[in-house]
Amino acid sequence: IVNENNKIVFPLILKPISNGSSVGVSLIKTKKEFEEAIKKIEKISDYFIEPYIKGKEITVGLVRENNGIFTLPILGINTKNEIYDYDAKYTPGKTELEVPAKIDKKTEKKVIEVCSLAYEVLGCEGLCRIDAIIDENNKVYLMEVNTQGGMTNTSDIPAMAKSVNIEFED
């Protein structure tokens, strides 16, 4: 997020570390927005900053099985907002989810390899969800590992599971 001249490169993403469901996640485009957002977020949470990567947002559900790691179908996220933030997740009509994600087979294989490796390297156990972005060159960027992903009617893991006829009890 800082170039060779020690200048902040915009746009970037500001995320609180203490919230779920993308509460407080912001796309920052200018120095003024950055300064205002930092003042606001410092009062409620520690935070981290990452570069904004334009591309297709996806998420993958993974679980360890006896013979390795099982992956659910990749879920594609198409939002009308600039980023998949709280508003995009919970406002009807703002986001369309596609299962399986509309990506080519080569990219799908790469996503599964990268996410499975992250699951393994991080020592994940049980069910988790890994969020990523695929840029215009089909490069995969991992954004987040969710070891306690949502399990509501509108959550991602149940949508992925349902697409392969896996149902969860209430």
What are the residue ranges of the model-derived segments?
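Phosphate-binding site of ATP-dependent enzymes
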Residues: 29-106, 110-113, 134-141
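Short amphipathic alpha-helix with an adjacent loop that forms part of the alpha/beta core around
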Residues: 2-7
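Flexible, glycine/proline-enriched loop segments at strand-loop-helix junctions
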Residues: 1, 22-28
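ATP-grasp fold ATP-binding core
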Residues: 8-23, 45-54
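Conserved metal-phosphate-binding beta-hairpin within the catalytic cores
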Residues: 60-62, 119-151, 161
